Amino acid sequence: MSNQETQVSSLPMPPERYIANYTDENIRRNRAPRPPPPPAQHEVYSMFGIQYNNDEMIRSLESQNIKRLIPIHFDRRKELKKLNHSLLVNFLDLIDFLILNPDSPRRTEKIDDISLLFVNMHHLLNEFRPHQARETLRVMMEMQKRQRVETAARFQKHLERVREIVNTAFSALPVLDDDDDSGGAKIKTEVDPLEANAAAKNDPSYQHDRMLCKLVDAIE
């Protein structure tokens, strides 16, 4: 069993495995597992079954026991052109050897030279990766900033439009005087005399007044 390879998943565990460890009860009782500490310098760590270390991502050619064809201080553009020209010349030489003398030991030497040129060229290109990553991040952040500025400008434009509509609506409202009762206009109504006489006859005091008037008329 010890000789069997350990099966390691290439994907993280399902969320339920983490949720069970970080419940409210575990957090309240300080039972939730703490995150692992960052690896120390030059420490090897495993992630999804693959070994990693904290060494520089782009190691020098000398540390890999590879012959360096480019100087320490150089112009990358010029050196890339030189390597490209050397690669083309060696490739043409290899073709000549394959045509004239395929069994010549120089054929193997040319293949090794071409391989070494490719390694140096790729190493030189890989040294641009940090700069490329920074430039990509800068472009991405500038794009996000521009999108946010445009969104804020559109929001401000719509806000000004809404304010204009609200101000126009307030301006269209009628202006009322302070003397108006309950904010409404006074309405004058006139009562028909016939309706007034009919209402008076139904009043009990009207009958008493009428009897008194008849008595006064009889005395006279």
From Swiss-Prot:
SUPFAM superfamilies: Mediator hinge subcomplex-like. It is found in: Nucleus. Keywords: Activator, Nucleus, Transcription, Transcription regulation. InterPro entries: Med7/Med21-like, Mediatior_Med7, Mediatior_Med7_sf. Its main location: nucleus. GO terms for cellular component: core mediator complex; mediator complex. GO terms for biological process: regulation of transcription by RNA polymerase II. GO terms for molecular function: transcription coregulator activity. PANTHER family: MEDIATOR OF RNA POLYMERASE II TRANSCRIPTION SUBUNIT 7 (PTHR21428:SF11). Belongs to the Mediator complex subunit 7 family. Component of the Mediator complex, a coactivator involved in the regulated transcription of nearly all RNA polymerase II-dependent genes. Mediator functions as a bridge to convey information from gene-specific regulatory proteins to the basal RNA polymerase II transcription machinery. Mediator is recruited to promoters by direct interactions with regulatory proteins and serves as a scaffold for the assembly of a functional preinitiation complex with RNA polymerase II and the general transcription factors. Required for activated transcription of the MtnA, MtnB and MtnD genes. Component of the Mediator complex. Interacts with MED21. This is Mediator of RNA polymerase II transcription subunit 7.
